[in-house]
UniProtKB/Swiss-Prot annotation:
The keyword Repeat does not apply. Keywords: 4Fe-4S, Cytoplasm, Iron, Iron-sulfur, Metal-binding, S-adenosyl-L-methionine, Transferase. Signal peptide: none annotated. Residues 1-27 are annotated as: Disordered. Binds 2 [4Fe-4S] clusters per subunit. One cluster is coordinated with 3 cysteines and an exchangeable S-adenosyl-L-methionine. InterPro entries: Aldolase_TIM, Elp3/MiaA/NifB-like_rSAM, LIAS_N, Lipoyl_synth, rSAM. It catalyses: [[Fe-S] cluster scaffold protein carrying a second [4Fe-4S](2+) cluster] + N(6)-octanoyl-L-lysyl-[protein] + 2 oxidized [2Fe-2S]-[ferredoxin] + 2 S-adenosyl-L-methionine + 4 H(+) = [[Fe-S] cluster scaffold protein] + N(6)-[(R)-dihydrolipoyl]-L-lysyl-[protein] + 4 Fe(3+) + 2 hydrogen sulfide + 2 5'-deoxyadenosine + 2 L-methionine + 2 reduced [2Fe-2S]-[ferredoxin]. The gene is lipA. Its EC number is 2.8.1.8. Residues 73-289 form the Radical SAM core domain. GO terms for molecular function: 4 iron, 4 sulfur cluster binding; lipoate synthase activity; metal ion binding. This is Lipoyl synthase. Pathway: Protein modification; protein lipoylation via endogenous pathway; protein N(6)-(lipoyl)lysine from octanoyl-[acyl-carrier-protein]: step 2/2. CDD domains: Radical_SAM.
Length: 323
C-alpha cells in the first residue's frame, strides 16, 4: 500500500488522497521505452522552481506529476494552478490532492502576474482545481487573474484550462467575457469511462460548455484534451472527436494516461506512437485546426508554440474560404 503525504507546514502532514485510501492497490504496468523521461536537473529547471516558490504559486506541473516538467521548466515555461492545491473532486486519474479547500488568496492574481512578467512569458497557461465550494466555481478569480496579467504583461497571450463550472449559472459567461486568447476545457476520457474515471463530471455538460464558449465569442480559440490507455475503444475516441467538432472545438490534444500511484485508475494499455499518429491524421480529417497527439502530449505542453500554429491555421483557413 502506498500512502502519499503532503507537507502543509514544517511539522504538519496530511494524506494527499484520503478518498482513495480504501481502494485496493492496482497493478502498475512497466512503461515502454517511448514513454520514459529523464529526471529534471538543469539550471533552468531549478531557477523556475525557485521563482514559483518565491511568489508562493502552485503549478499543475508539480501537483499533477507531469512527465514534461523537466523540459518545460528548463525553458522557463510553467502552467500556474490557481485557487489553491486542494480540489473538491476526486477523479480516479488525477494526482491533485482532494479535500476541503482553503480560502482564496486575494494576492494570487497579482502574484501570478508578477511571475509572468518576471519570466518574460509570451504565452501563459492558467488552470485551477475544481472549486465546487464557491458560488461561482471560481469564475471571478479567473477573471481577476486574466486582468492582472493583461495589466502587467499586455503582449502576453493567455490560455486558460478551466473546470466544468457544473451548476454554476453565469460562471462561464463571466470567464469568457474576460477575453482569454484560448479557452481550454478537457474532456479527459470517452463517455463510457466517466462513472469510473471522472465521476463528478458529466460528459455532455462538458461538450455543451465548449460549444457555449463559441456562441459567446466566435473568435475565441477553443481547445480540449483526452487521455488514452484507460480502456477506451478506438471507435469511442472517434465519436468523441465528432462530438467536439459539433461544438466547433479548434484544437485537440491526445496523450497517454500515466498512473500516479497504485491507488489510482490503472493503465489499461500503453498506446503506441503509431496509433497516436493515426488519431492525429483522423482528427485533422475531421476538421480540427490543430492536433497534438503523442504519448507525452499534455494540454499545456508546447502551448506557446502551438498557439502560434493555431493562429496561423485559422488565418490559412480564412484565406482559403475567401478565395
Amino acid at each position: 500500500m502506498v500512502t502519499i503525504l503532503d507537507r502543509t507546514s514544517s511539522d504538519e502532514k496530511r494524506i494527499r488522497h484520503p478518498e482513495k485510501a480504501h481502494r485496493p492497490d492496482t497493478e502498475v504496468m512497466r512503461k515502454p521505452e517511448w514513454i520514459r523521461v529523464k529526471a529534471p536537473t538543469s539550471k533552468g529547471y531549478h531557477e523556475t522552481r525557485e521563482l514559483v516558490r518565491s511568489h508562493k504559486l502552485v503549478t499543475v506541473c508539480e501537483e499533477a506529476g507531469c512527465p514534461n516538467i523537466g523540459e518545460c521548466w528548463e525553458k522557463k515555461h510553467a502552467t500556474f494552478m490557481i485557487m489553491g492545491e486542494i480540489c473538491t473532486r476526486a477523479c480516479a486519474f488525477c494526482n491533485v490532492a482532494t479535500g476541503k479547500p482553503n480560502a482564496l488568496d486575494m494576492d494570487e492574481p497579482e502574484n501570478v502576474a508578477k511571475a509572468v512578467k518576471q519570466m518574460g512569458l509570451s504565452h501563459v497557461v492558467i488552470t485551477s482545481v475544481d472549486r465546487d465550494d464557491l458560488a461561482d466555481g471560481g469564475a471571478e478569480h479567473f477573471e481577476k487573474v486574466i486582468w492582472a496579467i493583461r495589466a502587467a504583461s499586455p503582449t502576453t497571450t493567455i490560455e486558460i484550462l478551466t473546470p466544468d463550472f457544473l451548476k454554476k449559472p453565469g460562471a462561464l459567461e463571466r470567464v469568457v467575457a474576460a477575453k482569454p486568447d484560448v479557452f481550454n476545457h478537457n474532456m479527459e476520457t470517452v463517455p463510457g469511462n466517466y462513472l469510473t474515471v471522472r465521476p463528478g463530471a458529466r460528459y455532455f455538460h462538458s461538450v455543451r460548455l465548449l460549444q457555449r464558449v463559441k456562441e459567446l465569442d466566435p473568435t475565441m480559440f477553443t481547445k480540449s484534451g483526452i487521455m488514452v490507455g484507460l480502456g477506451e475503444e478506438r471507435n469511442e475516441v472517434l465519436q468523441l472527436m465528432d462530438d467536439l467538432r459539433s461544438a466547433d472545438v479548434d484544437f485537440l490534444t491526445i496523450g497517454q494516461y500515466l498512473q500516479p500511484t497504485r491507488k489510482h485508475h490503472k493503465v489499461e494499455a500503453f498506446v503506441t506512437p503509431e496509433e497516436f499518429k493515426s488519431y492525429e491524421t483522423v482528427a485533422y480529417a475531421k476538421g480540427f485546426l490543430m492536433v497534438s497527439s503523442s504519448p507525452l502530449t499534455r494540454s499545456s505542453h508546447h502551448a506557446g508554440d502551438d498557439f502560434e500554429r493555431l493562429r496561423a491555421a485559422r488565418e490559412k483557413k480564412l484565406l482559403a474560404a475567401a478565395e
